[in-house]
Amino acid sequence: MKKKELIWSDEFEGNTLNLKKWSCEIGNGKEGWGNWELQYYTNRTENIYIKDNILHIKAIKENYKYCKYTSARITTRHNFQFKYGTVEANISLPLNKGIWPAFWMLGNYSENWPNCGEIDILESKNLESKIYSYCHWYSNGVASYGKVSEFIDVTKFHIYKLDWDKEYIRIYIDDKLNYEIFIKDNFGNTNAFHSYFDLMFNVAVGGNFPGNDIDDSGLPKEMLVDYVRVYQNEGEKNYIINENIYNYNN
């Protein structure tokens, strides 16, 4: 087994989000970010903040701009992208009707969705205490393949891990395999998963996945992230940090 090295991480130290690592996506997006979500994403400390080395992403019931809810969505798109490796994050999720937290990845931004590829390390919804792990890509239309976990208490911290190489994408919960997909030689038109991806966290309110029947009495709700770390095989360096290309030839 090849030795792995840490290439990027955020331990969420300090008092504010590290904008050398993350960008906040703001607004309601086109057609509710393509999912008919109901929230307005902000960069306010009411919706995203760090306390005791924990990242908090909070969905709130409030009238803001033209929406009835606010939350936050962050991405490494402008700061860090990588191809292949291991991602680990220690996360606690909220449960509430109409809530949709996610830790996920998007691929090549020169392509529209689903051509760019999407890897959902975790999604959950409503009061379902289980994890949805999925991949989405283009194969004569939208192709989706995934798996739903057995019951786990998602409100407790669990380590969610992605292992990604030229042959497989595998997703683990506390080191137990939850999902895998074969991508070698672009099997099933999975060529999207051989490009560079970024990391994303968000908590949506409503939308196609959880539905729009929101339990306002249960809000606010928070996703908590203890850390996120990315490893690659020693010497590979298939990543981009702050637009500096370390290796773009594999």
What is each model feature region?
Residues 1-250:
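GH16 jelly-roll
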